[in-house]
Amino acid sequence: MTAILERRESTSLWGRFCNWITSTENRLYIGWFGVLMIPTLLTATSVFIIAFIAAPPVDIDGIREPVSGSLLYGNNIISGAIIPTSAAIGLHFYPIWEAASVDEWLYNGGPYELIVLHFLLGVACYMGREWELSFRLGMRPWIAVAYSAPVAAATAVFLIYPIGQGSFSDGMPLGISGTFNFMIVFQAEHNILMHPFHMLGVAGVFGGSLFSAMHGSLVTSSLIRETTENESANEGYKFGQEEETYNIVAAHGYFGRLIFQYASFNNSRSLHFFLAAWPVVGIWFTALGISTMAFNLNGFNFNQSVVDSQGRVINTWADIINRANLGMEVMHERNAHNFPLDLAALEVPSLNG
């Protein structure tokens, strides 16, 4: 009898833990995805802060020329970054215990791999946690689907691109100027501005901003008056009220006359689906573009595509971009390359005499 009671107590302890983890009554929902999300994101955040402040220079190119990225080694908030793992490590899994010492681990940029891998696992679990909470509350799953766009984008620049290029040293540095450097080098090597998927991403982000501003201003301009001139318009709404707080018919009429009738949504549900889907699909395409360019399926090349009747090149904007690309390419990692690939001759010129 004693053994049976102990087993029930043990089961009930596990049951209480499960109930607490999956309870929607907690101030912050944890969930089973949260069990993995919390330690991974805490680890990534803690190591990022410490490394951004105090990490020593990293031999990013594997040529014994360390690059400083932390505040204590001369950087500021703008120039500072977590320097990617060394090209000498490549794609190898490089935890602390694989290095001969902590100094070696820091010199080879071990913190970058640690932060990136924990971060990607953490944001993936955050997405799963969004789905899990929606499921518990009986909601539809589209919040997690929308969040998959930034998760895909982060995975593309921090994991897929390094895999395609053969080294974590090609991943995006974790800092402001490091991000810009990554963008410039990416343009030089892959001509991303001429890739259709990047164009769709630009349309998604800029279009999403435009539609968000249009929707917010239109709703704010068609609020149903509930207050006097001396009160804030926000006082006219009470959380949870049943009646609509703005006149969708008036908003529809205004916008239909401003543009044309069928440019204006007359269904609130389809409108909000569109507002969510437009930027999400655009960012999905950008992530796909990065993931294809990771394996060197690059943007369109229209260099020297227009010639006159004598065969002389008439430069287009594509040629101007190409010239800029060449300049950017020869300047990056300048001590690692003797002959940049794009500038190397296809065959050795013959010498007469």
Curated annotation (Swiss-Prot):
Cofactor note: The D1/D2 heterodimer binds P680, chlorophylls that are the primary electron donor of PSII, and subsequent electron acceptors. It shares a non-heme iron and each subunit binds pheophytin, quinone, additional chlorophylls, carotenoids and lipids. D1 provides most of the ligands for the Mn4-Ca-O5 cluster of the oxygen-evolving complex (OEC). There is also a Cl(-1) ion associated with D1 and D2, which is required for oxygen evolution. The PSII complex binds additional chlorophylls, carotenoids and specific lipids.
Site keyed Tyrosine radical intermediate: positions: 161
PANTHER family the UniProt entry points to: PHOTOSYSTEM II PROTEIN D1 (PTHR33149:SF58)
GO MF annotation list: chlorophyll binding; electron transporter, transferring electrons within the cyclic electron transport pathway of photosynthesis activity; iron ion binding; oxidoreductase activity, acting on diphenols and related substances as donors, oxygen as acceptor; oxygen evolving activity
Residues given in the record as [CaMn4O5] cluster binding sites: 170, 189, 332-333, 342, 344
Annotated positions binding Fe cation: 215, 272
Organism: Sorghum bicolor (Sorghum)
Chain positions with Phosphothreonine modification: 2
Family named by the database record: Belongs to the reaction center PufL/M/PsbA/D family.
Residues annotated to bind chlorophyll a PD1: 198
Membrane topology: Multi-pass membrane protein
Site entry: Cleavage: 344-345
Catalyzed reaction equations: 2 a plastoquinone + 4 hnu + 2 H2O = 2 a plastoquinol + O2
Lineage: Eukaryota, Viridiplantae, Streptophyta, Embryophyta, Tracheophyta
Annotated site residues (Stabilizes free radical intermediate) in this chain: 190
Protein name: Photosystem II protein D1
Keyword Nucleotide-binding attached: no
Binding annotation for chlorophyll a ChlzD1: 118
Gene3D superfamilies, per the entry: Photosystem II protein D1-like
Membrane-crossing segments per the record: 29-46, 118-133, 142-156, 197-218, 274-288
A Pfam family this chain is assigned to: Photo_RC
GO cellular component: chloroplast thylakoid membrane; photosystem II
Primary residence: plastid
Propeptide residue interval(s): 345-353
Function: Photosystem II (PSII) is a light-driven water:plastoquinone oxidoreductase that uses light energy to abstract electrons from H(2)O, generating O(2) and a proton gradient subsequently used for ATP formation. It consists of a core antenna complex that captures photons, and an electron transfer chain that converts photonic excitation into a charge separation. The D1/D2 (PsbA/PsbD) reaction center heterodimer binds P680, the primary electron donor of PSII as well as several subsequent electron acceptors.
